[in-house]
Regions:
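Glycine-rich FAD pyrophosphate-binding loop
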Residues: 4, 20-44
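A conserved short coil-to-beta-strand element within the FAD-binding core of flavoproteins
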Residues: 125-138
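Beta1/beta-strand and adjacent pyrophosphate-binding region of the FAD-binding site
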Residues: 1-11
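Glycine-rich loop(s) and the adjacent beta-strand/alpha-helix scaffold that form part
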Residues: 152-198
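An anion/pyrophosphate-binding glycine-rich loop and adjacent beta-alpha core
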Residues: 33-35, 40-41, 49-56, 89, ...
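Short hydrophobic core segments
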Residues: 4-6, 29, 129, 148-164, ...
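Glycine-rich active-site loop/strand segments that organize a redox cofactor
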Residues: 44-92
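A glycine-rich dinucleotide-binding beta-alpha-beta segment and adjacent secondary-structure elements
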Residues: 125, 298-377
Length: 400
């Protein structure tokens, strides 16, 4: 049986290797000059290839449960065993994130490339697919390098995110030609643009924070974790996780940052009173020294209206104003940084048109899809790559 796989990213390579290991003849088409370019950019170049906590709760889409079968059929243990058999050594951090022992994304890609070579998979790079045509029970795949006949096709062309490293709309358009539909698309795992007044002065400062995104009094989404101030707004793992809701949320949003998320109001008030005594004789802007980054502490006090006053001159009412800024430092959201900067696409091909136990189309027999092209996206921390491995493996089994 001849299988044509469109897209040589993580999911496509997994599907190709699985299909080949099952004894099928595999043709892998990739529009870039080499396979796996986006893989090299994951985990800040370290390749966070999975997460020990991978479960449906960490995934999103119009049908969140669609991912459950694939994640259990080829779970984290099976994934790591599969990579281990191909020579990759990994290390697991306390957070559950799994990286190659080398801390180099290239190690993961090299293992996959060598596996493709060992399986003698017919790989065509620099190949753009323009159309998939039905041909009896099979297909003709039309490309700029000619046409290819296939008994089955696996669509693994990825999403719109990360256009600089291979993100494209091709997969959606090819599926549409065959009668499939997609949901709305949004950038996810992406930085927020905010009013730059405060972030610009805090560029490079990291902090642990509780995060609440609001539209007026309405809470749109919440999170917690490490944030990073940038010249254009805020970034960091915790921001990435709430960015999906921000992308889809439209205009009029604000983000509130709680820099003391483990404390209640009484604890905060008592601590500020203690800090006032400790900082006696110093400027109010130093009140938070020892707890927050010095620049962040000064900015919080400035936002409350205090900078050069002596700390011991602050009244209890003044401390309440500082506490408010500490617990709800508010920035208007101007938007997100877009698909170019996004790590993943939220949205994709409608999953109610695919069988979750095979990844086969319900509309077009012998057509399969896997990875980011489908309407499934995961949280930050290796979840999206686990979806690529799990769905790619399931699609590569070519079950009916």
């Amino acid at each position: 049986m001849t299988v044509c796989i469109i897209g040589g990213g993580a999911a496509g390579m997994m599907a190709a290797l699985t299909a080949s290991e099952c004894g099928h003849s595999v043709l892998l088409l990739e529009r870039q000059s080499r396979v796996g370019r986006k893989l090299l950019a994951t985990g800040n170049g370290r390749c966070n290839l999975t997460n020990r906590h991978a479960a449906p709760a960490h995934y999103h889409g119009e049908e969140d449960g669609f991912c459950a079968y694939a994640l259990s059929a080829f779970d984290v243990d099976a994934t790591l065993q599969w990579f281990g058999e191909k020579g990759l050594v990994t290390v697991t951090e306390d957070s559950g994130r799994v990286y190659p022992y080398s801390n180099m994304a290239g190690s993961v890609l090299d293992v996959l490339r060598y596996a493709l070579e060992r399986e003698a998979i017919d790989l065509r790079t620099g190949c753009t697919v323009s159309r998939i045509r039905r041909r009896g029970d099979g297909f003709t795949v039309e490309t700029d390098l000619g046409s290819f006949a296939a008994d089955k096709v696996i669509l693994s062309a990825g999403g719109a995110a990360g256009s600089k490293v291979g993100g494209v709309m091709d997969g959606y358009q090819l599926a549409k030609q065959l009668g499939h539909h997609r949901t709305a698309l949004y950038p996810s795992l992406v930085q927020l643009k905010t009013d730059p007044t405060y972030p610009r002065a805090l560029k490079g400062v990291k902090a642990e924070a509780g995060i609440t995104v609001r539209r007026g009094a309405e809470v749109v989404t919440e999170g917690r974790g490490e944030i990073l101030f940038t010249e254009y707004g805020v970034s960091g793992p915790a921001i990435f996780d709430i960015s999906r809701a921000v992308s889809a949320g439209g205009d009029g949003l604000t983000v509130e940052l709680d820099f003391l998320p483990d404390w209640d109001d009484e604890t905060t008030a008592n601590w500020l009173a203690q800090q006032r005594a400790i900082a006696a004789g110093r400027e109010a802007g130093t009140l938070l020294t020892g707890t927050l980054h010095s620049r962040l502490g000064q900015m919080v006090c400035k936002a409350a209206g205090f900078t050069t006053q002596r700390a011991d001159s602050l009244t209890d009412g003044d401390l309440k104003r500082i506490a408010k800024q500490l617990r709800a430092f508010t920035l208007p959201i101007l938007g997100v940084c877009g698909f170019d900067q996004a790590q993943v696409t939220a949205g994709g091909l409608r999953t109610d048109e695919f069988d979750p136990q095979t990844m086969q189309s319900k509309l077009v027999p012998n057509l399969y899809a896997c990875g980011e092209v489908l309407d499934i996206d995961g949280d930050c921390g290796g979840y999206n790559l686990q979806w690529a491995w799990s769905s790619g493996h399931l699609a590569g089994l070519l079950m009916e």
